[in-house]
Amino acid sequence: MARENKKELIGRVVSDKMSKTIVVEIVQRKMHPIYHKYLKVSKKVKAHDEKEVSKVGDKVKIIEVRPISKDKRWSLVEVLEKLK
């Protein structure tokens, strides 16, 4: 049975130096459990960019896919906003 509920994330491209691979930084706001203050938490993930359309600074949407390599478990869906 195929799993249809795949995670989608939106983030900024911070590196496109690898062939068909981009590094996307995802920034989320999480509340501290004791101090109840919102903190910015970021993580970087590698995503597959088959057509190499995204550049550094672009806002992109990525989706969870089967493992492509040791580090890649995400794939580019679309470029939401190009950097000018």
Swiss-Prot record:
Gene3D superfamilies: Nucleic acid-binding proteins
Pfam families in alphabetical order: Ribosomal_S17 (PF00366)
GO CC term, one of those recorded: cytosolic small ribosomal subunit
InterPro entries linked to this entry: NA-bd_OB-fold, Ribosomal_uS17, Ribosomal_uS17_bact/chlr, Ribosomal_uS17_CS
GO MF annotations in UniProt: rRNA binding; structural constituent of ribosome
Swiss-Prot/TrEMBL GO biological process terms: translation
Keyword Ribosomal protein: yes
Keyword set, alphabetical order: Ribonucleoprotein, Ribosomal protein, RNA-binding, rRNA-binding
Function: One of the primary rRNA binding proteins, it binds specifically to the 5'-end of 16S ribosomal RNA.
Subunit (UniProt): Part of the 30S ribosomal subunit.
PANTHER family linked to this entry: 40S RIBOSOMAL PROTEIN S11 FAMILY MEMBER, SMALL RIBOSOMAL SUBUNIT PROTEIN US17M
Family according to the record: Belongs to the universal ribosomal protein uS17 family.
Protein name: Small ribosomal subunit protein uS17
UniProt source species: Borreliella afzelii (strain PKo)
Lineage: Bacteria, Pseudomonadati, Spirochaetota, Spirochaetia, Spirochaetales
